[in-house]
């Protein structure tokens, strides 16, 4: 795969108002305090990590995010593709409309590309695509953007990922018994009891050239669907192992060169078992350092492929440990982890429905930009 640069990036999350603040909070081990929603089926509260209320609409947040990523004077964008990656898209708008009008009507339906097309028209992007592949949406956005750049179809690609609070996600994941009743987000803990959903908005500008101060290089990656089950992936880890191997092959590296694995780590039963087995199939006993980020961001669903990627590359000098390392299914660290700035990184994103993706990344330093 042709290496592609993440020239700039922006993040708004429960962990911080911007990427710098989120990285500082992560390195300081500061977890955001979750709010809650009522799980109707059980009439019980469940935690939720929301972005601080700024009074902005989703459109205003996305515009601000694009401004942070493109700069104050972005110029013409007729050489730039927009890829919008999200699970929720505009479902929260639809939910409010249904509530206001007393039920759903056929005319309430909107096209899948409504948000992306609105941004394309207002900002002047060359084209706009929408990716909706569950928790791999943004990771797939990075991969598709990289392929289009390598093919010379566009000069730049702006990947925008957003995940807003919605009843269908909250109630749906809750009904599947996937949300944590204890509010303890513990990926790979033997007594883990589910995930904490999170809100996030993230963006990055991709290009073949590094630009002035690039964040990272996307060296390779792979995405595929495990069709053995309608909702999950094979718990023996075989499909995850294959996806990671193909990602490494596309980058021209082997498992022994990986300096850190960013695990998907949802803290759900089946997903953590599958990932744990897959990681052990790939690395055997020679596991590199491992980290999880969802306890600090929440599971940002369609946005996690970008929100976690940006946070990862900004925090390599101090990634927090977990307080249950001795019990974990994989050898997580109890102490903060520091890896070399130019380490090769493997980042995993495994989606509901069996769509699995892995990225091979390297943070840009003065020497390797």
Enumerate the predicted regions with their spans.
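Short conserved active-site loop signatures built around small residues
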Residues: 138
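Short gly/pro/ser/thr-enriched loop/turn and capping motifs at secondary-structure boundaries
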Residues: 165-167, 297-298
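Active-site alpha-helical elements of protease catalytic centers
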Residues: 141-142, 205
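Glycine-rich phosphate/pyrophosphate-binding loop and the adjoining helix
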Residues: 153
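Conserved "HGTGT" condensation-loop signature of ketosynthase/thiolase-family condensing enzymes
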Residues: 1-128, 147-150, 172-196, 202-204, ...
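Glycine-rich anion/phosphate-binding loop at the beta-strand->alpha-helix junction
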Residues: 156, 161-166
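Short beta-strand-to-loop elements that line the ligand-binding cleft
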Residues: 130-132
């Amino acid at each position: 795969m042709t290496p592609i640069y993440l020239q700039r990036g922006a993040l708004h999350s429960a962990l911080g108002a911007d990427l710098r603040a989120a990285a500082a909070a992560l390195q300081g081990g500061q977890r955001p305090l979750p709010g809650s929603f009522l799980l109707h089926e059980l009439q019980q509260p469940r935690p939720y990590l929301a972005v601080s209320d700024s009074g902005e609409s989703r459109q205003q947040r996305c515009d601000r995010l694009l401004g942070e990523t493109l700069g104050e004077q972005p110029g013409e964008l007729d050489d730039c593709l927009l890829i919008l990656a999200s699970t929720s898209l505009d479902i929260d708008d639809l939910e409010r409309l249904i509530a206001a009008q007393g039920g759903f009507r056929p005319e309430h339906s909107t096209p899948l590309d409504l948000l992306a097309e609105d941004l394309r028209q207002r900002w002047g992007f060359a084209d706009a695509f929408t990716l909706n592949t569950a928790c791999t949406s943004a990771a797939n956005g990075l991969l598709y953007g990289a392929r289009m750049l390598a093919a010379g179809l566009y000069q730049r690609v702006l990947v925008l990922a957003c995940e807003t609070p919605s009843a269908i996600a909250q109630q749906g994941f809750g009904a599947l018994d996937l949300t944590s009743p204890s509010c303890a987000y513990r990926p790979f803990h033997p007594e883990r009891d589910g995930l904490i959903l999170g809100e996030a908005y993230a963006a990055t500008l991709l290009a073949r050239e590094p630009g002035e101060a690039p964040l990272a290089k996307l060296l390779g990656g792979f995405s595929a669907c495990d069709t053995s089950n309608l909702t999950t992936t094979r718990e023996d880890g075989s499909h995850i192992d294959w996806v990671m191997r193909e990602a490494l092959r596309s980058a021209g590296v082997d498992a022994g060169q990986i300096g850190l694995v960013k695990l998907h780590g949802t803290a759900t039963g089946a997903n953590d078992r599958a990932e744990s087995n897959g990681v052990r199939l790939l690395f055997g006993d020679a596991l590199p350092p491992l980290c999880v980020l969802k306890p600090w961001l929440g599971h940002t669903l369609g946005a996690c492929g970008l929100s976690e990627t940006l946070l990862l590359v900004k925090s390599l000098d101090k990634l927090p440990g977990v307080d249950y390392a001795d019990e974990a299914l994989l050898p997580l660290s109890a102490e903060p982890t520091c890896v070399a700035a130019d380490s090769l990184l493997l980042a995993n994103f495994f989606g509901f429905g069996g769509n699995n993706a892995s990225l091979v990344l390297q943070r840009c330093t003065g020497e390797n930009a």
